[in-house]
């Protein structure tokens, strides 16, 4: 009996010890679980903070913001941040480069210029950049569009400056061929558009538009652009090029861009650099006269002769300004019209001293509001 009791008490002792040990382990396990949970919570909190910080960095990163500006708003890009520009001087190299680009299905735009670039030219480059992957800006002082007594030899040139400006505006390629490259010895072929070139600048500058049509046709053939961008300041030139493209079934879209003006209203032109301060002041009368014609139209005047006369009267007040022509014409055909029924363009050419300036304004009859 005593042995049995002893055996039971031993088992009871072990059980009690086991229970006590189990209790201790459970207590320790509980503490461990709590510690693990606390650590996990801390980790989660840190991760959450890190994620927020990362998100914040992604949204407000100056590097990413500046990238967006380059793509969406090229006008804000400084010259240092702009992409590089390639300079090509031969027709062979120009064609080779564009063949490589077309294998990547890239859209090509052309901006033809004679150089000495100003903001008017650069606005064309920026528009081309918006519409195409590759922007080719040509700088070529075309001898074919200058008359014998005109300013070919003294026309302003600054190729290095033009290159910097084009790079900042987003042009991809500067195409600057020499005259001997573009018109080699023995050159005998010319392109001439009739009809729209008969009057105005075509009458006062014989051969001018033949030179324009020839150089533009050659550029289109060399570069084969998807689109070409021209300014509306040379309005007769723009109409001539559109007629050239239409008549010869050239596969290129012509984009016309509004005239860019100085603060005083003078249309930007490379030839403005010829003007003295006094002449510059008198030259602003051209745009004042054009605006006067627009006001007269808005006030009810429809007679084309009266609209032209109001421009002439204002221009004749300037001592050094000699009027070459003022005409109210159809926007498509450039035919003079007796009255403005819907739309028209007023064309002006004048000399201020020795400098010939052109400008224009588009008129549109205001629609009457229905009552």
Regions found by a protein language model. Name each.
Residues 345-371:
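Generic C-terminus detector
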Residues 2-8, 14, 22-25, 31, ...:
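Nucleotidyltransferase catalytic core that binds NTPs
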Residues 339-344:
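A short, glycine/Asx- and small/polar-enriched loop/turn
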Residues 19, 29-52:
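Compositionally biased, intrinsically disordered low-complexity segments enriched
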